């Protein structure tokens, strides 16, 4: 489901005008494009708060501005260092050209993992992965199945499965994404606890 958000055009720029916008209840934002001119907009703080999970993620968003609808993908956001208020949003046009995106990793089946059930812990080293794809092929997350992981196992980038049209940009395929740590369990102990 694509989220649609209303925005207004920005005509003045710079720190002072951005602060005036923020005091008026808006967050400044920019839509970047390779073959298009950048578009400066502002989104209400209420809409940013309501849809922050989407705006900080990797899905397609529709920004409506004065009757025009722009399909965009969130690229980055800036938070205030103390209050964690959103100060600025960056988007890129959701075109047919491939772009780089940070996609979250989703660790699945931890409840089915025998090692986790017996007290081992999943040590997550990376929470996102850099990929190249079009906005149409951009996944919400990359699943990392840990059902068969045992104590001492390392899950690497080379173990991840990417959908068609999504190319991982990891510099080293042997980079570790997560490890399973804890005491090794003997075979007799597993039968006794079951």
From Swiss-Prot:
Organism listed in the record: Neorickettsia sennetsu (strain ATCC VR-367 / Miyayama)
Protein encoded by which gene: rplY
Key words of the record: Ribonucleoprotein, Ribosomal protein, RNA-binding, rRNA-binding
One Pfam family, short name: Ribosomal_L25p
Quaternary structure annotation from Swiss-Prot or TrEMBL: Part of the 50S ribosomal subunit; part of the 5S rRNA/L5/L18/L25 subcomplex. Contacts the 5S rRNA. Binds to the 5S rRNA independently of L5 and L18.
Gene Ontology biological process terms in this record: translation
Listed GO CC annotations: cytosolic large ribosomal subunit
GO molecular function, one term: 5S rRNA binding
Top-level division of the source organism's lineage: Bacteria
Annotated protein name in UniProt: Large ribosomal subunit protein bL25
InterPro entries tied to this protein: Rbsml_bL25/Gln-tRNA_synth_N, Ribosomal_bL25/Gln-tRNA_synth, Ribosomal_bL25_b-dom, Ribosomal_bL25_C, Ribosomal_bL25_long, Ribosomal_L25_dom, Ribosomal_uL5_bac-type
Reported function: This is one of the proteins that binds to the 5S RNA in the ribosome where it forms part of the central protuberance.
Family: Belongs to the bacterial ribosomal protein bL25 family. CTC subfamily.
